Amino acid sequence: MKYIYPALFQPEEGGFFISFPDIDGCFTQASTIPEGLDMAADALSLMLWHMEEEHMEIPAPSPISSLNGNNGSFATLISADTLAYRQLHDTKAVRKNLSIPRWLDTLAVQHNINFSNILQNALMRELGVSKA
């Protein structure tokens, strides 16, 4: 899933404290604004991934205009793509048991077919996703 949430960058000694008012417990820190943008995207992606995995309700994002920046703080929009994040970080292989006709297994073995690779490619094609 793709999401966009407002983040609040608050200056602090040595950099910025970055929080997402709509997502409880989602925050990070950075030394610079460019680093903060990367760190914020990573923190948001991780938190939303966790919420999806736990079947937690994901709140609607507030309008960015609802965040008031003061004392040098500012708001910006951060995007997160949990599918892309999963493809980068959730790569542990899982074992799947499947059944195919014996004749098909025999033919595939004769042709040195990699069953795992074929199944992965077929699933990605069927689901309309590509490798990260």
Identify the meaning behind each predicted range:
Residues 22-24, 111-113:
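A short beta-strand motif that forms part of the nucleic acid-binding face
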